[in-house]
Amino acid sequence: MDVIKHELYDTLVQKYKSEILAYRTTLRVYFENLVAVGEHPTHLKDMDELIEKAACANDKLKMLRLMYKEMYSKL
């Protein structure tokens, strides 16, 4: 049962890291390649939403680590 707990913890950590990376990559496209999204009239709104989602995933990751890192992370 302990193995499952560690795997669940690790899966959540990877989920949040993956979400953050996906949002960061999309934001990079906006910043570096505006031509790719040139016909999209809501750049700032969309970018703000991506930052909000990344911040939420980051907060979840921090809270998970704060609450459970000592118990479930593999050192």
Q: Whereabouts are the PLM-identified features?
A:
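Extended, charge-rich alpha-helical interface modules
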Residues: 2-75
